[in-house]
């Protein structure tokens, strides 16, 4: 049985032999992040991987991320050690999108501007593009939202209700959730949100903020905008994973901070701050199971198979889906 160090050595050699680019999301296991040529959030990795001069992209993340790279750079080979799926992305597909549009019309909404969070599959992104909409990430969501407001239409934000509600609150707008609020409330809302959510960021509660502020009156709270509105509105800072990292790394060593995002990222930030004055904003383990499925063995096996011409877990998209999804993604990049 090979040791972790043996696997790491073999992975580095295979990446070199295959002339491959290895990218990993911040929420991946530490040993995967350690080997990656680049780490980042969804937007950063999509840009880096699609613009790389490497023809083989090895993506350690969840499936929609690999799809985004494939859509942006259709000619590249994109493989994933695990075809893990984001739970939020699984909450909507092209059928549910069509059904949601039908429900909007039943509520009297004749025109709308769709924004899909990047945590959605390529088919949903393609549908949004066909309806004139765009993709956003947590990093550029405010810019994309401001662009959408200029279209003078009701905004349909999917699939994350929390991010949609937080953007509405940020702009002083009225929001409603499709399937939760009444048809009248849907019709009168400025922003209609699909009823999806992140299972990890739902774990952070206002009570957690109150607990830490009572214990440490000078503590700062930094959270991801996928958290509930009550959490985001009471935090000192809200931003994407990259923005949270930037925020925390600028703090003085003596400044206490509680962070509301996935535990692997928080633990890395703790380590950088010598495990002092850094806390995770939850009494439960804020762990993303699908983001952490990929192991060193998985990475080694997928690379070895590719070298032996037995490739598997390749990300494949239909031509039309890739075309329309790329339009939505490139539009996002142009606007951000």
Curated annotation (Swiss-Prot):
The keyword Cytoplasm appears for this protein: yes
| Superkingdom of the organism of origin | Bacteria
Molecular function via GO: 4 iron, 4 sulfur cluster binding; metal ion binding; quinolinate synthetase A activity
Cofactor binding comment, as recorded:
Binds 1 [4Fe-4S] cluster per subunit.
Which Gene Ontology terms of cellular component type are present? cytosol
Q: Where does [4Fe-4S] cluster bind?
A: 86, 198, 288
Q: Which cofactor does it need?
A: [4Fe-4S] cluster
Q: What is its main location?
A: cytoplasm
What Pfam families has UniProt attached to this entry? NadA (PF02445)
Iron-sulfur as a keyword? yes
Tell me, what is an example of a GO biological process annotation in this record? Answer: 'de novo' NAD biosynthetic process from L-aspartate
- UniProt KW keywords: 4Fe-4S, Cytoplasm, Iron, Iron-sulfur, Metal-binding, Pyridine nucleotide biosynthesis, Transferase
Write down the EC number.
Answer: 2.5.1.72
Binding of iminosuccinate: at which residues?
Answer: 25, 42, 117-119, 138, 224-226, 241
Report the subcellular localization. Answer: Cytoplasm
Per the record, the pathway is: Cofactor biosynthesis; NAD(+) biosynthesis; quinolinate from iminoaspartate: step 1/1
- Reaction catalysed by this chain? iminosuccinate + dihydroxyacetone phosphate = quinolinate + phosphate + 2 H2O + H(+)
- Reported function: Catalyzes the condensation of iminoaspartate with dihydroxyacetone phosphate to form quinolinate.
Q: Family assignment?
A: Belongs to the quinolinate synthase family. Type 3 subfamily.
Q: Which PANTHER family does the UniProt record give?
A: QUINOLINATE SYNTHASE, CHLOROPLASTIC, QUINOLINATE SYNTHETASE A
Q: What is this protein called?
A: Quinolinate synthase
From the broadest rank down, the organism's phylogenetic lineage runs: Bacteria, Pseudomonadati, Campylobacterota, Epsilonproteobacteria, Campylobacterales
């Amino acid at each position: 049985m090979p040791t972790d160090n043996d696997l790491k050595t073999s992975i580095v050699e295979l990446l070199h032999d295959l002339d491959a680019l290895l990218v990993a999301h911040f929420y991946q296991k530490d040993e995967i992040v350690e080997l990656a040529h680049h780490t980042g959030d969804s937007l950063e990795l999509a840009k880096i991987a699609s613009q790389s001069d490497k023809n083989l992209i090895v993506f350690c993340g969840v499936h929609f991320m690999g799809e985004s790279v494939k859509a942006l750079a259709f000619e590249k080979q994109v493989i994933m050690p695990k075809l893990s799926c984001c739970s939020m992305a699984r909450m909507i597909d092209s059928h549910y999108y069509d059904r949601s549009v039908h429900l909007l019309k039943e509520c009297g909404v004749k025109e709308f501007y769709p924004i899909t969070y990047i945590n959605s599959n390529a088919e949903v992104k393609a549908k949004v593009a066909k309806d004139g909409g765009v993709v956003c990430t947590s990093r550029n969501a405010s810019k994309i939202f401001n662009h959408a407001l200029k279209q003078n239409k009701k905004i349909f934000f999917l699939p994350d209700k929390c991010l949609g509600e937080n953007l509405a609150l940020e702009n002083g707008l009225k929001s409603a959730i499709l399937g939760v609020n009444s048809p009248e409330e849907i019709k009168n809302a400025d922003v209609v949100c699909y009823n999806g959510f992140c299972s990890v960021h739902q774990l952070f509660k206002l009570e957690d903020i109150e607990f830490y502020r009572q214990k440490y009156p000078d503590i700062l709270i930094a959270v991801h905008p996928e958290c509930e509105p009550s959490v985001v509105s009471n935090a000192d800072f809200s931003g994407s994973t990259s923005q949270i990292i930037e925020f925390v790394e600028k703090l003085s060593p003596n400044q206490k901070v509680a962070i509301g995002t996935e535990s692997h990222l928080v633990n890395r930030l703790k380590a950088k701050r010598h495990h002092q004055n850094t806390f995770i904003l939850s009494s439960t383990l804020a762990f993303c199971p699908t983001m952490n499925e990929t192991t060193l063995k998985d990475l080694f096996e997928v690379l070895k198979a590719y070298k032996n011409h037995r490739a598997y877990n390749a990300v494949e998209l239909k031509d039309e889906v890739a075309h329309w999804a790329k339009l939505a993604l490139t539009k996002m990049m142009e606007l951000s």
